[in-house]
Amino acid sequence: MIVLDASVMVEVLLNRPSGARLAHRLFDPEEALHAPHLIDLEVAQALRRYQACGEMSPQRAHQALVAFAQMPLERHPHWPFLDRIWELRRNLTAYAAAYVALAEVLHAPLLTCDRALASAPGHRAIIELIEG
């Protein structure tokens, strides 16, 4: 079981080297993938940004969004974790804290490409930094 943040998912969807290295792990049928519902908005926004700046065609961005929607990813509401998200406010954005809180509750590692999130203190999550 692993928790993914949007940075990892975008790396996979864009088929970047770090995403390609993760593919075997993320597409393993024995591996359960989890994320807060927030991931949907963050991935859609990232794809929108890449399309808007010309790094992706509108068609490619849409294909990536469709591929994301088909991922076997169990999404969790973040409202049960609001108190913990608030407790983490000194070191993490509310967005990052949603992923961390979920990883804490599930006792699962959180995969991220976000160096700031990976180095943030004050939580009990196991965070794996995926570097490009």
Predicted segments, located by residue:
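Alpha-helix capping/helix-boundary segments
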Residues: 8-9, 39, 81, 99, ...
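Short, well-structured N-terminal submotif of metal-dependent ribonuclease cores
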Residues: 1-38, 50-59, 122
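Active-site-proximal, substrate-binding regions of enzyme catalytic domains
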Residues: 44-72, 84
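Acidic, PIN/NYN-like endoribonuclease modules and their adjacent C-terminal/linker elements
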Residues: 1, 100-132
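Phosphate- and divalent-cation-binding pockets in alpha/beta enzyme and binding domains
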Residues: 21, 42, 84, 119-120
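Active-site neighborhoods of divalent-metal-dependent phosphate/nucleic-acid chemistry enzymes
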Residues: 71-113
